[in-house]
Amino acid sequence: MQLIDTNIRDFDQLRREHRWQIPENFNMAEAVCDRHAMDEDRVALFTETATGRCNRFTFAQLKELSNRFANALRSMGVTVGDRVAIVLPQRVETGLCHLAAWKLGAISLPLSILFGPDALRYRLEDSGARVVIAAGAALDRVHALMPDLPSLERVIDCDDQRDGFWPLLEKGSAGLEPIQTQSDDPALIIYTSGTTGPPKGAVVAHRCLLGNLTGFEMSQNFFPQEGDLMWTPADWAWTGGLLDALIPAWYYGCPVLGYDGGRFDAEQACHMIARYRVRNAFIPPTALKMMRQVGDLRALGVDLRSVMSAGETLGAQLYEWAMSALGIGINEMCGQTEFNYIIGNCSEIMPVKPGSMGKAYPGHVVEPMDENGCKLPIGKIGELFAHRDDPVMFLGYWNREQETKEKLNGDWWSTGDIGYRDDEGYLWFVGRKDDVISSAGHRIGPGEIEDCMLKHPAVLQAAAIGSPDKLRGEIVKAFIVLADGFKASKGLQEEIQNTVRTSLAAYEYPREIEFVHDLPLTTTGKVRRVELRERERRRKGLTNS
């Protein structure tokens, strides 16, 4: 079942010899759940809540439950191509909703429980979602938006014991013949960060899971092995939590631990890792930094076999701490929702260079290029392009064909990242061509934040950038030109911060605000964020060298 030949211990040989074999028909629900259900005792998921309530689910149970919910959705009229939005944390219903949607040939739409009303409204309206499954505060926000969303026909409450998720599921039949989807059929829409204008919905095909797997296997040091069990603190609403942890682990029939407990607590996470004997993890650098403060992890019982990290640069100090504290090399990985899991490390068979992105994983081709689309020699800095003849490449942006075309240069996809290749084939990240902010593992688009701040009557102009931060990699910083009649104050700053926090998401609000007289603009009136970033780096004593 592994795509990587574990008998070959040479990374470059694995790259040379790899060939994709993508079937014409492929359905993620069948691949990650139903085919494992023959073994009725095979565990798929452990769940735990903040109150200590624990549950265990087998693949056989997930198959039956997702069949029942798929039939319930079908009775509501959900059919091939319809969008089913899921606004839930790490709980079993999240996985069941995705599986059920895929079995119907529908498109699942994962959305963060941290999204405020504006962020939810935009994504639900843009996608034309017909059904939303949610719980708690997110459910209340969706209910309030229903009058503004003509395509939204049904909102399902996971916690309503009378008419909610579980009663609906019980009414559905356990028998279902899943739609025979083609590998190129859409499975997911995941909204990416918008650098100019609103976020864009990246349409992910069923085959993209297969394209993930060479990188997943190698970043988890030849996954799967006996006793492997996967966990991540990353929200299952994002590519990282869903497609880099939950779904690929299920593809191999391995159990996953899900925790629905709110804000990340490093000490609690370490105890949970020990208690469930977690062996594999995707842990963003910010979470690793917080775990570093806990103390002797191995004394707590933490015994990880492999860790992948992504979302921001890991750095040499954090890598060396992990080597000492965990006894393993952290495998840094780089990817995007549009073109995921393409670059990274495998400490099992290759030297890891702290600070490097690693190498292109088997089956993926990445090249630094100049502005004319010509490949650059070793050591020369250019934009990183990925070859589009790759099963992991997405289908395009939802209803944005022109914006998809603009990211293509012939057979190459523009990643927007600037970097170079060294003489040993390692790729090094230099900066971003675009203005996406990387904070605590989240990719945050400044456009949505700026639009939100401009709704405040005091804000005349606004620009958001990433400001260097030791813990989070970057924090959101806003530069604001005030409208006439308003004066800068601590109270006004907090008011604007709360506007973003409540309208968008808690991780998107500007932790720092600087009131300025004007913003640097191009001749066409666009904000020069690069100038603001350079100014901020100088202020914090950093250089661009």
Residue spans for each PLM region:
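AMP-binding/adenylate-forming catalytic core of the ANL superfamily
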Residues: 115, 132-135, 281, 385, ...
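Structural core segment of the AMP-binding/adenylate-forming
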Residues: 75, 99, 103-168
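Conserved pre-ATP/AMP-binding loop-to-beta segment of ANL
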Residues: 41-43, 157, 172-191, 197-198, ...
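Conserved AMP-binding/adenylation subdomain of ANL enzymes
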Residues: 210-232, 237-279, 293-294
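Conserved AMP-binding A3 loop
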Residues: 55-60, 187-214
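Gly/Ser/Thr-rich phosphate-binding loop
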Residues: 251, 278-282, 292-352, 365, ...
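AMP-binding/adenylate-forming catalytic domain of the ANL superfamily
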Residues: 502-526, 545
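Conserved AMP-binding/adenylate-forming core of the ANL superfamily
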Residues: 41, 45-99, 116-121
